[in-house]
């Protein structure tokens, strides 16, 4: 190997080790279940995005099998070549009916959706206003676009308005936000963001990755909680890989936006389409989340229980108001030690460190699901509290 490159890479890896930011892969089995196997140890799964427990649902498995038998295992090409199966159009119609939008586009992942949409819509003549805690895919999309990047303090609408007010009137304006923030579990002020976008002539993209299938009418997303709010949002992005238990993502909104993305979005144009099996499972999942209110109600109730008990115990869980509940520790060292102790006690509790979260805010990110029982959560809370006291971390 080229020696200068080897030296450079070894130095960078050593720095990651020293900073407590080196990452390893761990073999995990049964991750679709409430209890998983990680490194051959049985643990309560409090780290998964399988929020409604659909990743192991027999109805989704059967739908995937049926489509595989009918269409094969691969799409064989990009959608613009010969990979656009009728399944795509069926799923996109379902999304439009679900979200109340004109047109939808199914893409390969949430990351490629955000990177592709933002980088194709915005250019160096534009300004993108982004919440400081938005997902990395949003940040990367803005960087790739070459647009002026204005980050406003997390959920600070006054700061955003100052930035909008002082922006060049000659430049087009785009606001982009997560609806549920993936590492903090709090939510965006969508009504107020829409008011600002209308006041200053911007458009807005919302990332519903951690809200699709859960919140709003029929689980359509956080933007559907308030009447008439969703239709004022220009582009909705959501994923199939979390609450819907599948893989892939969608972009939906007015037809002109989606038509433009279909023609200009490089992460859509230059990639092989999703396999038919995934589309079959997605179609079934969209049906289920609209009808199965009990799963969504269980998830929301479990989130409320878990948050309230951790707060009562004295933990810093920030402003979490959803099924995503962080315990903010601070240092990488303490967070890694806490994570190790929790896993030894039988809880899949993963340390989240910079650059995923800001420096000095390393945390354990817990995610409850609709399938957890109160007994599961109580068992976990007792052990979390006991270990934290032993380590003199929080309580």
From Swiss-Prot:
Identify a single GO molecular function assigned to this protein: 8-amino-7-oxononanoate synthase activity
**Which sequence ranges are marked TM in the entry?**
none
UniProt cross-references to Gene3D superfamilies, sorted A to Z:
Aspartate Aminotransferase, domain 1 (3.90.1150.10), Type I PLP-dependent aspartate aminotransferase-like (Major domain) (3.40.640.10)
**PROSITE patterns in alphabetical order:** AA_TRANSFER_CLASS_2
Provide the cofactor list for this protein: pyridoxal 5'-phosphate
Report the Pfam families cross-referenced here. Aminotran_1_2
Per the record, the GO terms for biological process are: biotin biosynthetic process
For this protein, what is the EC number?
Answer: 2.3.1.47
UniProt binding sites for substrate: 23, 135, 356
Q: Which residues carry this modification: N6-(pyridoxal phosphate)lysine?
A: 242
- Quaternary structure? Homodimer.
Q: Which family does it belong to?
A: Belongs to the class-II pyridoxal-phosphate-dependent aminotransferase family. BioF subfamily.
Name under which the protein is recorded: Putative 8-amino-7-oxononanoate synthase
Output the lineage of the source organism.
Bacteria, Bacillati, Bacillota, Bacilli, Bacillales
